[in-house]
């Protein structure tokens, strides 16, 4: 009994731990930007670290189950590398640099709704307006998009949750982003969420033909390293930007590479297999709350009223989508039970035909069932 309960708790603890991990990434990355870290270089180093860390595990544990590489699989891997390590990460970093850590983490709660819209476009999701849960998915998506629009168009007065001490974390360029930069950052975050959602959809297809999760993560990060290195050589002209040392930039690269591009990818794929994508996304608002507190405490960020109102709408919309989606998904065990119950009248009730069952064995006039 205790073992069964522990198995149910493990996915919950894993996803909650990831929310703390993501919140830490928001803060550490923002600190590195304030100290002059270039986001193209950071994305490159991040995926170098992730590749180096994950490759040994892929080689050790998936040597016998790793599928053969084909051209079709390679093109999918290349597309995954473009969508997440290159486009999503750099758009996200641009958004983070031009807004704030708490704002960015709040906006990413729109991810499930964007994924739902893309799933409708690609016919991976259906809507039946006669069903309450289908209507809830549509209404939740509209509410989430509305919350995102509020955060974009209405900034409102600043609200200081925690009075932060002025320590070394606040060094560097700590000025509040201007309105123009805020809009640019918001557009970048929207692009980041869209490419991230597309990444999840393509990843679900890829896992069906390439089910070795560790190897998949390693290959995606490896391709992401190459793509980001090429982009960095084009976009970054200052050689000193590549210098690394014992500073916040190195910490951001190592932390985000290990926790958010390596471990997180793997844990999410495992939890999605066990409990489904709805369960995985339902904990994302926790990251927003943790980041808002840490951002106020560590970075002296002020949360604006528009961000709070928009975040409330996003969370309400998110849970409406999550609830509706959960009604679409049937637990595999439940499916087996339903299937078995449907088979009982046909397969388990033995027909009597002159004292013989369907197979021809004598029944002695007795009807049996299993």
Curated annotation (Swiss-Prot):
Entry GO MF terms: amino acid transmembrane transporter activity; L-amino acid efflux transmembrane transporter activity
Gene Ontology terms describing biological process: amino acid export across plasma membrane; amino acid import; amino acid transport; intracellular amino acid homeostasis
Keyword Nuclease in record: no
Membrane topology: Multi-pass membrane protein
Keywords: Membrane, Repeat, Transmembrane, Transmembrane helix
Keyword Ribonucleoprotein: no
Predominant place of localization: membrane
EamA domain ranges (all copies): 23-143, 195-322
Subcellular location: Membrane
Gene Ontology cellular-component annotations: plasma membrane
Listed SUPFAM superfamilies: Multidrug resistance efflux transporter EmrE
TM ranges: 11-31, 41-61, 67-87, 102-122, 142-162, 182-202, 216-236, 252-272, 278-298, 303-323
UniProt cross-references to InterPro entries, sorted A to Z: EamA_dom (IPR000620), WAT1-related (IPR030184)
Family: Belongs to the drug/metabolite transporter (DMT) superfamily. Plant drug/metabolite exporter (P-DME) (TC 2.A.7.4) family.
Listed name of the protein: WAT1-related protein At1g44800
Organism of this sequence: Arabidopsis thaliana
